[in-house]
Each structure stands twice: as C-alpha cells, then as structure tokens.
Amino acid sequence: MTDIFERVKSPFYHFGMLMRLNKIPYEDFKSYITDRLGDVAEQAAHIADEILAFTSCHPYYTQQLSFAVWNNLVAGKYEDVLQLAIEDIITTHDLDYERLWLNFNKTDKYVMVSICEGNNPAQDRNQPTSTMTSALLRLSKKGYIIRSDRYEIEDPFFRKWILKNMIE
C-alpha cells in the first residue's frame, strides 16, 4: 500500500509526509462504537466487541465494518448483523480480491492460505526456507501481511474471502 508513495514512478511519490497510524486502543474504540450503535442496537457493547475482534482494532477496517453493521441495523436487519455486514463487504470486494489473488504467484498463495489457517510459514518445512522468507518479505512489503507476534493478513475481509473461496 505504501508503494504508491515510495515508488519513484508513482504520481504520488513523496506526495506528503508518510505517517504510519497505530491501532486505536481497544477500550477507546469500543466506547466510541458502543456510543454510536447505542441508538440502533440493544446490545451495542457486544456488537462493538465482535467488530473489534474481527478487525483487530485496525482503524480503517473497523470503520468499514461498523458502518456496514450500522446500515444493516438501521435497515431493520438484526439477525446475525455482524456476519451479514462481513458478507456484504466481502461480496462488494469479491472481484477486487479475485483479481488480487490471480496476480499472486503460487508461493504467495501458499503463504497466504497458510497464514489464514493459523500457521507460521516461516516455520514451514514443506517448502525451502529461502522461498518462504522471500515470499513473506515480498507480501509484507506490498502490505498484504503484517507481523506482530505472528504473521497476519492485513485485511480481515480478504482473510475471510481466502478462507471461504480458496480453502477446500
């Protein structure tokens, strides 16, 4: 994602100061979401917990999911409101995810599926270590995966799409 600001041939190269945003603290985010959903949902705190668990407090994905949940609640859809919102977002981005997936090489796909299944590709002994390391670095640099205490798919909706469509 940062490529568009760091690649010399990009029209956005050094467009402005690049700022990396940290995750918003859980309790602050929960309080904010609970307040906003309080007018349309009886169990706003529970829904906020579910949203934050799914997005891991990532600001963009939390905002996206919260908005979809809110829209569903306002439309009178109360049953499985979180899953419905997740499915709506995945359906909206289905072609984008498919196009993205088709541009990955075989190793990158293997790594992405492995991460989705909760495995650590760096410790995978079915593939050469150098191959796994190269793939992890490449996917990290492109912003598809992040590493905290373990590797994770950055976009929780893409992770869910992979689990739904690519794992048999």
Label each PLM-derived region with a short phrase.
Residues 1-53, 74-77:
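Helix-loop-helix "sensor" segment of P-loop NTPases
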Residues 21, 111, 155:
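Conserved RecA-like P-loop NTPase ATPase core
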Residues 45-52, 63-66, 112, 133:
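Short, well-structured alpha-helical segments
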Residues 57, 63-129:
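Winged-helix-like regulatory helical subdomains adjacent to P-loop NTPase cores
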Residues 57-58, 155:
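Short loop-to-helix capping motifs
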Residues 125-142, 146-148, 152:
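Short amphipathic alpha-helical interaction segments
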Residues 150-156, 160:
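Minor-groove-contacting beta-hairpin "wing" of winged helix-turn-helix DNA-binding domains
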Residues 158-168:
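Short, amphipathic alpha-helical interaction segments positioned at domain boundaries
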